[in-house]
Amino acid sequence: MSKDDEKRIGDENHPKILQAFGGEYNDPALQGYVKSLGQLLAASSELPDRKWTFTLLDSDVTNAFALPGGYVYVTRGLLSLAETEGQLAAVIGHEIGHVTARHGAQRHAQGTLAGIGAAGASILGSILVGPEAGRTIGEFANVGALGYVASYSRDQEYQADELGIRYNGRIGFNPQGMAQFLAKLDSEKGLVAKLRGQAPKGSSYLDTHPPTPDRVKRARKLAEKSLVDKPMDGRDIYLSKIDGMIWGDSPDQGYARDGSFAHKNLNIFFSVPDEFTLFNSPKNVTAYGPDNAAIKFDMGPKNYGGSMRDYIRQTWARNAQLSNLQSIEMNGLEAATASTKGRVNGRSMDIQLVAIRGKEGHTFQLTFYSQPQKTKTLSEVYRRTTYSFRHMSLDELEKLKPLRIRLHKVRNGETIESISQMMAVKKFAVDRFKLLNGVKQNSDLIVGQTVKIISTE
């Protein structure tokens, strides 16, 4: 693959990456920070004169990746997890390493890519660890920009680690930044499992290619060989940069919190059963429950002219065998429902479809999945979710605001548990606080230390 081909692949797929990951994060100062750090690292690489493009994506998925042609991406989810400038620099340096070593071009030449549209791969071993930790591989593949995972071989990942550590050291950062961040990701698996609840195994990037302890050990050994005089971590400046950054769902994608989903722009609200865990993505909202039960919310075409009953029969499920097709009304909204059957992840499932006509011509879709032997048990809780769907009042709309990373200085007598009570996210608040700040026990807290919390302010 020529350098012109690499540039073409990057140019063609950059818009697809933006679409898949919520676009650029709307914060010029933070975008500028990521770009300046990236350019500084690129200048220390083997390709300092290449045109590099660094983008902070508006996604809470913890991820970073690169495209051939010098395109490098990090998500705000990754920024929220990192603790120091050195850790972020290590991740960006790793991605630059994939580009300078032409790993994407090598994989393409070997025929291991699922088409040019799949030219971007997760750098950290295909990791998904943020609040959206239940999102499926298919959601990214369908966008076309990330049609595969684990595109890089183990040796290529090792080489990118080595190059990233080298670039980090050249500009004076602590070369242990990569090992620190990989270790943090590895220790995060437990929280992912709790968040995901009963989500199917293999549904996340983390399941597919977790960072191994061997890779962490190797990164530590490489860092020990990198001689840096007075290495910088840049913790304080880094935390000051991300203070106020959105954590979790962005306003444009709605908010999945505490068992309910609310979207200000669409003016909709619905809740899911207590035992289900919600995950939000640019394409849909999913909720996983026990025994492979699941709920999916997404949208159909706008300004459909027929009834919702006709919409199910003639458009949404026109190729399915339907039963119990009927019109219903819920909270003043025209709707229809029908039953069908299908296979999901190799399992036979009963499927309930609900189509809803909303304001401004929107068509909303709720899909309920259950194993046949569990359908009767789940029918009532699924019915409650269906009839919880409604538009919101002006007062409710006004109160909808994103969660943000805020800084807090540890005071005398405070503990992990007491500070965690300040968190706006109540579910697994202690676990989240420990993960955000890299602390495991109260003795890790120091009076006067700055820590991250999640706040509504």
Region annotations inferred by a language model:
Residues 416-424, 430-434:
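Short alpha-helical segments in extracytoplasmic peptidoglycan/chitin-binding modules
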Residues 74, 89-98, 102-103, 118, ...:
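Active-site recognition of the HExxH zinc-binding catalytic motif
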Residues 73-90, 150-155:
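Short pre-active-site segment immediately N-terminal to the catalytic Zn-binding motif
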Residues 428-457:
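Extracellular LysM carbohydrate-binding repeats and other cell-envelope/extracellular binding modules
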Residues 1-63, 146, 249-250, 254-256, ...:
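Hydrophobic or amphipathic, alpha-helical segments that drive membrane association/targeting
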Residues 7-11, 23, 32, 147-148, ...:
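Extracytoplasmic and endomembrane cell-envelope/extracellular-matrix remodeling and assembly machinery
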Residues 78, 83-87, 96-113, 128-129, ...:
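Catalytic Zn2+-binding segment of zinc metalloproteases
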Residues 112-132, 136-148:
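Membrane-active amphipathic alpha-helices enriched in small hydrophobic residues
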